[in-house]
Regions:
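Structured alpha/beta reader/binder surfaces that contact nucleic acids or chromatin modification marks
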Residues: 1-114
Length: 114
């Protein structure tokens, strides 16, 4: 199963279902299917989500893709992304990874016949 380390402060947002996407730059490629998030501050904490879509777009278009353009204007988006990727620019292509919440993932898995 693909896995991805996630900043400790973001981990509860995934668990609660508030965070349903991640934006990656120059990282291993994600693909639709199960994905395990691993909390960077405590690697014993993990949660599985179902990746539903992966799309490559310039960073300047990523906020609109996930419906956050009102709260993530370019300046805010660039500042936030530079906390993780200091050299990133608005015209750099990023991978936007969208996924179900953990609860939706469990329900989707339970609905599959083995």
């Amino acid at each position: 199963m693909q896995s991805l380390k996630l900043a400790e402060w973001l981990f509860p947002l995934v668990v609660s279902g508030e965070k349903t996407h991640t934006i990656r730059w120059r990282e291993p490629r994600m693909h639709p299917g199960p994905m395990r998030y691993v909390c960077e501050g405590d690697t014993e904490k993990t949660v599985v989500v179902l990746v539903t879509r992966c799309e490559d777009v310039p960073l300047s278009q990523a906020a609109a893709l996930v419906g956050k353009q009102d709260i993530w204007p370019d300046k805010v988006m660039l500042s936030g992304m530079r906390e993780h990727y200091p050299d990133i620019e608005l015209d750099d292509v990023v991978q936007v990874v969208e996924h179900l919440t953990p609860r939706q993932t469990e329900a989707a898995h339970a609905g599959k016949s083995d």
